[in-house]
């Protein structure tokens, strides 16, 4: 169970004295203590205090006056996930670049231990689509400095070669399996669960992996909008987007022009310019997209 309360400055300082303990503090925390049945973490800027564990409610009640509003509880786990899943130690994976013509297909996996969940949430780790590029860069660097991370940038030439053999969903499955397996190899303590941001059914996902030498299949859960189910998937989406941004900068430099995100008409115009410059779209873009034919038509005009 998670309980979060807001306290005034005198109470916060009193709690800081009560729960002060040796050891490294989570990012943004003023104090962090593991007691029997409960872990307590207080955050400096917000004066929010999180209680995690079976005795969270009882411990939080010590600091709440009788007429205070009820402390906020963590949201229930989404359907299909165990109760309390959001507080587990989880290895999460997500990908970006699927719908973008230029750039790589980037997949990342991030392991978040149970005692890191609160600090990453407090930092603002959330769905990467809701964050600005500067926020992505800041958060990704913090995630990569504190959590085990694996990412795979499947650059356009490599992506296009594999698309001759696989469909895009199968290629995504292979990439997720790869980054999950590589991260698991580095973990001294195995996660309580693995959460994949769902893009196909569980059955189809594992069918796509048949014949692979290593298949991650134990304690695996699938969830659409996985970043809302656990911060590990949100962290993975941020790392993936960060690495994708870096790759796009490199490709733009090679192309001599800023390559746009997405697959709209602006993309067609830039792709046509690359063709006119004599550059090979295979090195910059996912050429199976309809944008390729549109760009070729524009380049002939």
Swiss-Prot record:
Endonuclease that specifically degrades the RNA of RNA-DNA hybrids. This is Ribonuclease HIII. Its cofactor is Mn(2+); Mg(2+). A divalent metal cation binds at residues 94-95, 197. Keywords: Cytoplasm, Endonuclease, Hydrolase, Magnesium, Metal-binding, Nuclease. The gene is rnhC. It is found in: Cytoplasm. Residues 88-301 form the RNase H type-2 domain. Its main location: cytoplasm. The keyword Transcription does not apply. SUPFAM superfamilies: Ribonuclease H-like. It comes from the Bacteria. InterPro entries: RNase_HII/HIII (IPR001352), RNase_HII/HIII_dom (IPR024567), RNase_HIII (IPR004641), RNase_HIII_N (IPR024568), RNaseH-like_sf (IPR012337), RNaseH_sf (IPR036397), TBP_dom_sf (IPR012295). The keyword Metal-binding applies. GO terms for biological process: DNA replication, removal of RNA primer; mismatch repair.
